[in-house]
Amino acid sequence: DSVVTVGSGAFVFSTVRRVTVGNNVVLIDMYAFQGCDKLRYVNIPDSVKRISYYAFYGCTSLKSLYLGKGVETISDYAFYQCSQLNYINLPKSLKTIGDFAFKDCYKLLYVYYEGSEADYEALGITGTNHVISDAKKFYNYNYEG
């Protein structure tokens, strides 16, 4: 539990299928899980504040994503080409979703947001994240990981 960062490229092209990040981790760094094409499920704890650029780029089998209630930033291209992603939850703590954070996530159907519709609109999600905009939203959603 002394690990506070999943380092840049830590699991790049690994065959890992499921990831539960440790409870002391605050940062998932660039390319941490790039190309983990067998990865299907990710559980990110409340301690994580930032998911960096390209952190899960090319995780083409990723179906579901649980983001802990402390996540504040999802950086540009963080989940780029996660082409099997069906649903995500977004915590109310979220302040920034970077450009193209969910680019090519064409199967994203559902977004569960912890806050209100007004809180969600205040995020200012841009057209570069149209797959989120196009997905069905559920507001005031209380989830447990």
Short names for language-model regions:
Residues 1-5, 14-27, 37-50, 60-73, ...:
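Structural signature of tandem-repeat unit edges
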Residues 103, 124-128:
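A structural signal for leucine-rich repeat
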